[in-house]
Swiss-Prot record:
GO MF entries: manganese ion binding
Predominant place of localization: plastid
Transmembrane segments: 1-13
UniProtKB keywords: Chloroplast, Membrane, Photosynthesis, Photosystem II, Plastid, Thylakoid, Transmembrane, Transmembrane helix
A UniProt-annotated Pfam family: PsbY
Identification of the protein by name: Photosystem II reaction center protein Y
Species annotation: Fucus vesiculosus
GO biological process, one term: photosynthesis
Superkingdom field: Eukaryota
């Protein structure tokens, strides 16, 4: 399940980046 792991990692990274972006944009 390499593809699943890569997809999950990308999803997690994207979600974290989105949270950081929202934190910066809400300023």
């Amino acid at each position: 399940p390499v593809l699943a792991a890569a997809s999950w990692a990308l999803f997690n990274i994207g979600r974290l980046a989105l949270q950081q972006f929202n934190k910066i944009a809400s300023r």
